[in-house]
Amino acid sequence: MARAEIEGGVIAHPVPVTAGAEVNIKYNGLLAASGADAVYLHYGYGPADHWADVADLPMHRTSDGFEASIKVKSNDRLNFCFKDSANNWDNNSGKDWSYTIHSGRKP
């Protein structure tokens, strides 16, 4: 499986993101560069303007920044952004980060 490095210091692995599978998200963006002591993955499913099943997950500090893994619980779009313990946000300049979730079946 591939890994995707996307803008803002974010890496997702594996891609494509598949329903029922685990996806690992690494973050070394604005909050990490600003010295955040803790970073949380804020994620949900659905269209960009109406997330469902929204959750916050503490990320673990690594030598590459921060990292967390989630099990993909939906067949809808995965959306995410990041916040630190002081409630500062990195939402990719208002665009968030987003992946289409695949069924895992070949067409």
Please report, for each region that a protein language model flagged, where it lies by residue.
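Aromatic-rich carbohydrate-binding modules that target alpha-glucans
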Residues: A32-K73, S85-H102
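Residue-level signal for pocket-adjacent positions within structured domains
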Residues: M1, D84
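Solvent-exposed, conformationally flexible loop/turn segments
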Residues: T18-E22, N75, G104
